[in-house]
């Protein structure tokens, strides 16, 4: 009996040791920046160009009902757009994000999928702003990036009960933007709050864009669903997948956390802060705000 007891105890000890070994937590592998994220971080400083229908309506947001003819750029619009890029480079900026389509749905390029764009027959000076800015960026060595509003207050398919109709419209337009204007370094989505997160099919859209521009860094505004001051390491990513975090117009806090989770997996997400140069916080140009801009050291 003693021998049997001894063997029993030895066997139990061996099994317990195996269990402890198997269950011990592996060393945490903290996510690090990808090549694309590091390139974005290294650019550091850029210009966010808000231009479009709202510029000529003198508003921040419009509802997509203004006639296309409201958009009335000058004949030398292409030269002016190239000038924006030159000024950005002169100021030390390494990237430019252009609002190719804001919430009103008006497109700054000639899209095959809508007449609510710069090529509308009622517009006299049909300048492809996306081409003018992207060409200048490539010439000047400035990284070209695209803002595209998910929310579209003009496009009829957006109002349909079948949400996939608009997703296809959106993918068609994104294909134009990703294949006609050279390298696109960032894709900045906005307006996701107007629908349920799952209605955007973000994984599908993300994969679609990456198939054309593998190194393009993609994110959706309000990525984490919190202001930067409230973000904590390990918070859930609301708009997944995303390559970086957005929440305009706030600055990151000291010791800004970079690690966030989705379905239990950790991801490294740098924060891109966007700030207006307007004292009153306007994104688009307004005549009444033309003389009151912030200097470089004004908070």
Where are these predicted regions, by residue range?
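Bacterial Sec-dependent N-terminal signal peptides
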Residues: 1-29
